[in-house]
Amino acid sequence: MADFKLVVSDPKTGKAYNVDVTGPRVNKFIGKPIGSEIDGETAGLPGYKLIITGGSDKDGIPMRGDIPGQVRRRVLVSGGIGYHPTENGMRRRKLLRGDEISAEIVQVNATVAAYGEKPLDELAPKKEKKEGAAGGRAPAKK
């Protein structure tokens, strides 16, 4: 069964929160296209409504809203999601994924459309990093 990370962006505060989606809750996301609204309860955020804005698969290939289905395609693009040209008029063939969430997707991006009673800070707490003696770095070689 596929597990993925849901990155929830809060437009009011400008912060993003990572939520792990595992088990049977994943099935409620599979088949949903970019732009669809989902209930936050499926991600452990009761009272919230989320809008899917994109994602990427296991190889880092981004989802693009104008490619239908769950497929990977080599598309000639001149800008937008997946390609940012350095000069005007440049086009390039890029590998992109369709707009539907499939089992190969490992990250789904979403924004908050409607807020619940509890703030996101409480529902998706920040994970603290463990720091060693050198501040998380390897000791210096002599």
From Swiss-Prot:
Residues 117-142 are annotated as: Disordered. Pfam families: Ribosomal_S6e (PF01092). Residues 118-132 have a biased composition (Basic and acidic residues). PROSITE patterns: RIBOSOMAL_S6E. InterPro entries: Ribosomal_eS6, Ribosomal_eS6_arc, Ribosomal_eS6_CS. Keywords: Ribonucleoprotein, Ribosomal protein. Signal peptide: none annotated. One of its GO terms (molecular function) is structural constituent of ribosome. GO terms for biological process: translation. GO terms for cellular component: ribonucleoprotein complex; ribosome. HAMAP family: Ribosomal_eS6. PANTHER family: 40S RIBOSOMAL PROTEIN S6. NCBIfam families: PRK04290.1-3. Belongs to the eukaryotic ribosomal protein eS6 family. This is Small ribosomal subunit protein eS6. The lineage of its organism: Archaea, Methanobacteriati, Methanobacteriota, Stenosarchaea group, Methanomicrobia.
